Amino acid sequence: MIEVIDNFAPQDYFELIQNHVLSWNQEWYYQANITAGVFGKEGLGKHGFNCHVVRNKNEFLDSYDAGLLTDLLVKMKTGIGCQNILRSRLDMTVYTPGGMMCDPHVDSPDPHVATIFYMNDSDGPTVIFNERYEGSTEIDQSKLTVQKEIEPKANRLLIFDGHYLHTGHTPAHHNNRVLLNSNFN
């Protein structure tokens, strides 16, 4: 299951979110590997920035970002037929000459639905592979086959089975690529 919905949020609400998230008011936290966790290994160009909105199941952080994004996340949760928001965070990767593919990964080993909501027009597609998480963190990237590539487009929502291995790319033609990555069950 892979679904792409353009213009997911009402335009005036999306512009409110976008104006804040892409402004100097947005707090960002450095991460040495933006796809960190059991799959991520540090390396040149794998860094990025994030800001958690929901870190633990259904617990919104006490922040302006969380308040601003609550309605959007509830709309996602309801629309995909899930009961829980497991995790949600803003992610930003930055310009890298030539672009770079981040590490293929899953966001959680537990069954879930993953979403990516793009905050800006950029390059650096999200890639969803045919291969699924089968319990091992060792991935032979040379054996992965692409199921679908999705280009970052402002106000676009990508929904997919979170057990598909997936990744993103750093932008090669834009200053940044900003998205809201969320997981539901």
Show where each model-derived region lies.
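Catalytic core of non-heme Fe(II) oxygenases with the double-stranded beta-helix
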Residues: 56-185
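Non-heme Fe(II)/2-oxoglutarate
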Residues: 1-83
